[in-house]
């Protein structure tokens, strides 16, 4: 005879798993690459300030992530503005994206993107950064870039396709780390 369990245990008690799908690996057209590079020039005129706008918006929208940064976890968002730590971190973010964007349309594009994004995903994945965190950053980046550069729908699509490429590589590395 099977043991008797309370009725509430008969239901499937497994937690629902929210699986974030890996975006497709897209191919950017020459025109999309031009759109991305032209709008990046706008952001790159003031790279640290652009990086701060992205990172500050990210932390404002998702304050729980501030605890992941020991250098400024105990500061308020207002205290964070223009601190050397935040300026340094934001300049690194912009350098990372700048190198990726500079590689677009070159013969080295694939190698540069795969290497840089794999290293970045490996580093962040080992610190417990998940696909959900990357999606949150993606949404903030697209919003800030779109606003700063006044992108139309076609330009937003180009940036979204670039993010799909970047996150395709990133998510494959994160999946490998979690096996």
For the regions a protein language model found, what residue spans apply to each?
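Globin-like tetrapyrrole-binding proteins
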Residues: 2-179
């Amino acid at each position: 005879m099977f043991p008797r369990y309370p009725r509430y245990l008969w239901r499937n008690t497994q937690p629902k798993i929210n699986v974030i799908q890996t975006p497709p690996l897209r191919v950017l057209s020459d025109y999309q690459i031009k759109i991305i590079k032209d709008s990046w020039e706008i952001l790159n005129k003031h790279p640290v300030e652009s990086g701060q706008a992205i990172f500050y918006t990210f932390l404002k929208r998702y304050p729980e992530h501030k605890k992941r940064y020991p250098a400024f976890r105990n500061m308020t968002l207002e205290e964070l503005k223009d601190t050397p730590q935040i300026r340094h971190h934001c300049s690194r973010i912009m350098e990372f994206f700048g190198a990726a964007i500079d590689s677009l349309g070159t013969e080295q594009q694939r190698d540069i993107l795969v290497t840089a994004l794999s290293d970045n995903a490996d580093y962040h994945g080992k610190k417990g950064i998940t696909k959900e965190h990357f999606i949150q950053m993606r949404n903030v980046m697209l919003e800030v870039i779109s606003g700063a550069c006044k992108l139309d729908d076609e330009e937003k699509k180009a940036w979204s396709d670039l993010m799909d490429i970047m996150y395709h590589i990133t998510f494959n590395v994160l999946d490998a780390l979690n096996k």
